[in-house]
Amino acid sequence: MIIEHKMAKEKQETELEITNETDTTTELTVEKQGKELIAQTNLSSSNLIKEFEREQLKKQLPEIYVGDTVKVGVKITEGNKERVQPYEGVVIAKRHGGLHQTITVRRIFQGIGVERVFMLHSPQVASLKVERRGKVRRAKLFYLRDRVGKATRVKQRFDR
């Protein structure tokens, strides 16, 4: 399978050839601006995907555990204005890892429980700050959904 992609854009010409001799190896050739820059690597398609995802990861994320109270700054676009809206609550679940890592944050708003799922590496998440550490003995805190008032509080942890 041979894929050739040629693109010319403002004095920049890029030629990309990917030759797949077997299912697991690929050859990558790149030429830029008259200089020949050739990079040949033998990467499987899954390794190419992992490399792309590694570039998309955010570098500065705090350690977040289930039970922690966090403040998430969410980018909101209203018309042509963009602002950051804080959302504070208890982390009741963590899922996956890598680029698709998510947390579920629960808070009480006007007497009603509201849960939001945030992708940690999404560009919509502007900031993430741990307000206090929680001491829990479960991986998922879905039982907090059934509790009301002071029963929804999580004990504070001081050793992390």
Swiss-Prot record:
Keywords: Ribonucleoprotein, Ribosomal protein. This protein is located at the 30S-50S ribosomal subunit interface and may play a role in the structure and function of the aminoacyl-tRNA binding site. GO terms for biological process: translation. GO terms for molecular function: structural constituent of ribosome. Belongs to the bacterial ribosomal protein bL19 family. One of its GO terms (cellular component) is cytosolic large ribosomal subunit. Pfam families: Ribosomal_L19. This is Large ribosomal subunit protein bL19.
